[in-house]
Amino acid sequence: VLLTRPERGVLNFMKNTKVLSRIRRKKGIRKRIFGTSEKPRLTVFRSAKNIYAQAIDDDEGKTLISLSTLSPEVKKEISYGGNINAAEVTGKLLNKKLKEKGVSQVVFDRNGYLFHGRIKSLADQIELKKKQ
């Protein structure tokens, strides 16, 4: 199975069934989830050492807010970005930024990842109503 990604070229996922399964789940989720400016889509990406989250307005195709464990405000509160504690801190600061922006609800997009561990701890810190 070949997948094309503009930033990385063509990737062969034949041997990496874990990545292929996540991408398959991601495509199914994205068919049903859509964000607006009043209710943006909150999507997360998880790497081995960091976690990234962004609120996206799909109507205009713009990112409203983005935050990761590499952001200076998060980095000063954590020692390592790839654990549940870092995801919780990121979620708290993201929740604060969303409230400052005037967002009352979000649609949570787990991006094909299973809803446990770092993804769940980040989502639990978002106090706005969420749907996955």
Task: Label every PLM stretch briefly.
Residues 1-13:
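Short, Lys/Arg-enriched N-terminal segments with co-localized hydrophobic residues
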Residues 12-132:
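Ribosome large-subunit tunnel/peptidyl-transferase-proximal elements
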